Amino acid sequence: MNAILDGFRRLADFKGRDRRSRFWPYALTVVGLSFVGLWLGMIPAMTAIFEQASAVAATHPEAATVISGPGHYSVEIHDEAFMPDMGPFFLVLRIGVAAIVILLAAAVTRRLHDTGRAGYWGLPPVIFLTICLTAFPTVMARLMAEEGPDMSLFMLLFLNNFLYIASLIGLIILLSLGSKTTANRYGPPAI
């Protein structure tokens, strides 16, 4: 519990070192709470999207196809003018991701310092994730609006997401490495 509270107290402390036993309880708590928060934030955003799609199907049946069955209900909208507003969904997603990055930035930096690495090693996943969250709405809007869409942007986004996952796995490996037992340029060994 002390490791978790210490992580929250040191949100803006990018100096020094943190052992694995201090970092992981805090990081997993932040990720867990963030997923719960994102889930709770997504409920109203997704509900609004479903309500908009159902309203289009009811008022403009020529612009939508409804398929329903036991445990299944879907609405496919054929006219771009009637597409639900995805803005709130992406806003909640962006706020949630920003919160995770802010809450973990200093702790990741201190953990990397403990392994003898600069905090900059934590940036590649953030960069690739930012590209995805910025480009995804535009790419999806283009794919849904075009007859025979240009898939090159989608493939670039797919490559970006692959690089994000690879860089995230690499960062997790770095964060899992053992501590340097001697003092390094970031300070004495963490207690």
Spans of model-derived segments:
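Hydrophobic alpha-helical transmembrane segments in multi-pass membrane proteins
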Residues: 30, 34-38, 122, 134
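Terminal transmembrane helical module of multi-pass membrane proteins
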Residues: 149-191
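Membrane-interface extramembranous regions at the lipid-water interface
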Residues: 1-33, 106-119, 173-191
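Membrane-helix exit/interface motif
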Residues: 40-44, 100-110
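Hydrophobic core positions of alpha-helical segments in small-molecule transporters
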Residues: 26-29, 123-125, 162
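Membrane-helix interface segments in multi-pass membrane proteins
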Residues: 37-97, 128-167
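Central hydrophobic cores of alpha-helical transmembrane segments
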Residues: 120-130
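Hydrophobic alpha-helical transmembrane segments
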Residues: 25-31, 91-104
